[in-house]
């Protein structure tokens, strides 16, 4: 199974550090068929899945690392600079 397939589904996201705003309960990622969107307070930010990277059209990249069963640690980067870190877990 490829990473894209493993990432398919709906994910809850929460901040773990850096300059990202609080996210618990207000941010979700929806992923399917090699693309997806981050939904924050009703606003959608679309991305494409590139292995374990989520690439947004405006220079933002979320780099993911497996972090347990149905969970990933993430680093949000803008033009190669770290903005912050987050953890995403599969929504039930």
Can you describe what each PLM-predicted range is?
Residues 1-39, 74-76:
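Tryptophan-anchored aromatic micro-motifs
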Residues 10-12, 53, 87:
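Ser/Thr- (and often Asn-) enriched beta-sheet segments in non-cytosolic proteins
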Residues 69-72, 81-83:
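Coil-to-beta-strand transition motifs
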Residues 3-6, 78-92:
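Edge beta-strand at a domain terminus
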Residues 18-19, 30-71:
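Contiguous, well-ordered beta-strand patches that form the walls/edges
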Residues 56, 76-78:
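Beta-turn initiation residues at beta-strand->coil junctions
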Residues 64, 74, 84:
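Short acidic, gly/pro-rich beta-turn/loop elements at beta-sheet edges
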């Amino acid at each position: 199974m490829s990473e894209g397939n493993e990432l398919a589904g709906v994910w809850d996201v929460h901040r773990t550090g850096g300059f990202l705003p609080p996210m618990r309960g207000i941010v979700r990622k929806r992923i399917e068929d090699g693309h997806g969107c981050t939904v924050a307070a009703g606003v959608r930010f679309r991305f494409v899945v590139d292995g374990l990277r989520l690439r947004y059209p405006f220079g933002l990249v979320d780099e993911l690392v497996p972090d347990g069963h149905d969970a990933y640690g993430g680093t949000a980067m803008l033009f190669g600079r770290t903005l912050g870190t987050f953890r995403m877990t599969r929504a039930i």
